[in-house]
């Protein structure tokens, strides 16, 4: 599980005619395209560029791992003819109406746009928490296409999606999907360097669904909420100390300072005790290192995935060393069971919701939120 994906309401009307989808090439390695249009100003994203060329939109994704482009998409309304002289790229006729999603993260975003009907297939259905999507799976309105690591090709072919939304990885392909004719929307937002940068990808996805204005408006709300919370916390003179996560086998993995959660903890007004670990992933530490640093921490936040909720008693049964930390002794542990709490599905594109949750824990008088949605105080 990567930390960048932590690692999510508006409505729009999908009014275009029958979707036509044509492929015009794969990944793009050339420099950014120049067309007679307006480049949309990105507020926080460093990997995404959108250019409105009047009759179509060019979306370019920078390669997060090396110089050049990861992909270029050409978004042309299905009600219009394909313009002549467009640059090389993957042609997508918008709005997309028949999509296969590898993650529930994007399904929740579709729903916020009012475009849930565009979700026709998903992978890893057993991990999806959202009741509305589980109901659509049960009714057969959404197809379970198997594991994202071992896709059911027959079901994908039967679905014949307009596009497949999947996460790219360095030097990695999409397995069986690579052999099919369907275009892949490479969802590289998790490689952004900030929570608001990742959330800004909703502006790209909104344009794929014919909801560009809705997405722009929603993103403005996200940024406004986020900045208001961050500003309110910035003036706090007291910043409670924070430890996080659990020991896993021989290592205790904690978010690095530059990871999504590492940034969020600090922006929420906590004195994150592992902030000296730079980088953007998770850092493996020994139990002894964590104990030396965090024995007297004020708060302990952790996430886990289990069919049964954990308690301090069950933690102690797993590892007796937990008893040596102050939050264990005084009950100041806040836990999120991601098997039943949609933290990952909802907050990837709504970092303002996650920030509000954390501020409610550390500085409840400042958040304006009375109840916690994702975390619970561990009994």
Regions found by a protein language model. Name each.
Residues 11-23:
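Bacterial N-terminal signal peptides
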Residues 65-157, 164-169:
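A short, structured surface patch at a secondary-structure boundary
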Residues 135-144, 268-281, 327:
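A local structural motif
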Residues 224-314:
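Flexible, glycine-rich surface segments
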């Amino acid at each position: 599980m990567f930390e960048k994906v932590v690692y999510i309401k508006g409505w729009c009307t999908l009014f275009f005619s029958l979707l036509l989808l044509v492929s015009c090439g794969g990944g793009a390695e050339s420099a950014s395209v120049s067309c007679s249009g307006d480049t949309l100003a990105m507020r926080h994203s460093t990997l995404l560029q959108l250019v409105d060329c009047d009759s179509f939109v060019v979306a370019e994704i920078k390669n997060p791992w090396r110089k050049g482009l990861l992909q270029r998409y050409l978004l042309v309304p299905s009600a219009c003819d394909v313009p002549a002289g467009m640059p090389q790229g993957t042609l997508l006729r918008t709005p997309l109406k028949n999509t296969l999603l590898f993650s529930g993260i994007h399904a929740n975003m579709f729903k916020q746009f009012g475009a849930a009907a565009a979700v026709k297939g998903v992978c890893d259905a057993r991990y999806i928490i959202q009741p509305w999507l589980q109901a659509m799976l049960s009714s057969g309105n959404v197809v379970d296409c198997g594991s994202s690591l071992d896709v059911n090709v027959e079901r994908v072919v039967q679905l014949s999606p307009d596009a497949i939304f999947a996460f790219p990885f360095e030097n990695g392909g999409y397995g069986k999907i690579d052999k099919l004719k369907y275009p892949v929307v490479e969802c590289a937002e998790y490689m952004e360097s900030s929570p608001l940068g990742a959330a800004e990808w909703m502006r790209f996805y909104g344009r794929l669904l014919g909801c560009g204005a809705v997405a722009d408006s929603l993103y403005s709300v996200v940024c406004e909420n986020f900045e208001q919370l961050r500003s309110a916390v910035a003036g706090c003179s007291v910043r409670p100390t924070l430890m996080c996560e659990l020991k896993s086998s021989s290592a205790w993995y904690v978010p690095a300072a530059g990871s999504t959660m590492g940034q969020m903890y600090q922006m929420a007004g906590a004195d994150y005790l592992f902030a000296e670990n730079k980088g953007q992933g998770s850092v493996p530490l020994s139990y002894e290192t964590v104990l030396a640093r965090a024995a007297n921490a004020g708060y302990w936040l952790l996430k886990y995935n289990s069919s049964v909720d954990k308690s301090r008693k069950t933690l102690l049964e797993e590892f007796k060393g937990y008893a040596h930390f102050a939050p264990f002794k005084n009950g100041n542990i806040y836990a999120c069971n991601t098997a039943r709490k949609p933290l990952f599905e909802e907050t990837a594109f709504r970092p303002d919701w996650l920030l509000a949750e954390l501020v409610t824990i550390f500085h409840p008088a400042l958040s304006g939120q009375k109840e916690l949605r994702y975390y619970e105080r561990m009994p």
